Amino acid sequence: MMFNNENYKDYDQELWEAIQAEEDRQEHNIELIASENMVSKAVMQAQGSVLTNKYAEGYPSKRYYGGTEYVDIVESLAIERAKKLFGAAYANVQPHSGSQANAAAYMALINAGDTVLGMDLAAGGHLTHGSPVNFSGKTYQFVGYTVDKETEKLDYAAILKQAKAVQPKLIVAGASAYSRQIDFEQFRFIADQVGAYLMVDMAHIAGLVAAGLHQNPVPYAHIVTSTTHKTLRGPRGGLLLTNDEAIARKMNAAIFPGLQGGPLEHVIAAKAVAFKEALDPAFTDYARAVIANTAAMAEVFAKDDRFRLISGGTDNHLFLVDVTKVIENGKLAQALLDEVNITLNKNAIPFETLSPFKTSGIRIGCAAITSRGMGVDESRTIAHLIIKALVNHQQPEILEEVRYEVRRLTDAFPLYKKN
């Protein structure tokens, strides 16, 4: 029976309305969640292609199904572009997410029950770096390293001392809420001192690495994992990289057949488009603008003694702010800013004293507003609007003023719609 529902707007009105509402939200909200970005229409078109119909267990030229000659071309393009982008000898573009990429890296390098040294979640790490509620913390014996209490930056001497004490089989470098450059060469030195593997999760900074604006972990890590969205500005998905042939075989086997079945070739096609975009010199300009916008926004908070900028600043696409002098906690700050169409997230800060469901801080990222074309001036304006809303959170008329200014900004920098 042939389809008679070619237009989903007519066929599924409820779904269409929900998607239209989300499109409107994205158009008229200022997006500051550090793990989010805005993809190009080319990326969306590739992801919405007929490749969604094709099952392709295995890898290019080694499939378990027929009719894969064209998806082999697509996946090979994505692999070669990823290798070129990050200077890696081997790449796997099949992980459905960054979490699955991390799971595959663990499977490739260590065994269940082995000791792993990873960044503590409260210090800026990720759930998959050993949180007890996550598969990583349930499967492996994670020990968390943190930041220096005074500087709130990584203390490599302290991490080396801790590594010598716990003798991990694997050290995980990388973060989801750390605003400073990470020295991967130092991490490799530490790993070598204790005979451990080094895994780098560069999910948040992959776009900055691709642009040459952050040290590339590929020459230092045994395995590098990443997402393909965030600063890389591709579809939601994962990526694995290595320069070691033996490890490449293990990581590929960990993804398939270890963790996944058929790859999502339509998403892989979108990854290929995003990698091509990131190879364009214009992407470096974009990444530079992300860093400049983030620094400009952070500076506004740094100059206001009602707020505390964690670690005193930022080197990348994000920063953390302690908001407890002006509002009870980060959860309330997040909810309040949602009301004025500014989207960000509550976030624990180093040595957090509040519940992770409340937190003392908020996390702010500038990748998405930069994709809209906003610059340093707009970034400073947004910072002032956030401060105005938080300081006056019990004054509805002022919150309405902020909401109006947010709408003026988003109208001036449309995302997909044209004014």
UniProtKB/Swiss-Prot annotation:
InterPro entries given in the database record: PyrdxlP-dep_Trfase (IPR015424), PyrdxlP-dep_Trfase_major (IPR015421), PyrdxlP-dep_Trfase_small (IPR015422), Ser_HO-MeTrfase (IPR001085), Ser_HO-MeTrfase-like (IPR049943), Ser_HO-MeTrfase_PLP_BS (IPR019798), SHMT-like_dom (IPR039429)
Positions that bind (6S)-5,6,7,8-tetrahydrofolate: 121, 125-127, 355-357
EC primary class: transferase
Superkingdom per UniProt: Bacteria
The UniProt record lists the keyword Transferase: yes
PANTHER family documented for this protein: SERINE HYDROXYMETHYLTRANSFERASE (PTHR11680), SERINE HYDROXYMETHYLTRANSFERASE 1 (PTHR11680:SF35)
UniProt name for this protein: Serine hydroxymethyltransferase
Species for this entry: Streptococcus equi subsp. zooepidemicus (strain H70)
Lineage: Bacteria, Bacillati, Bacillota, Bacilli, Lactobacillales
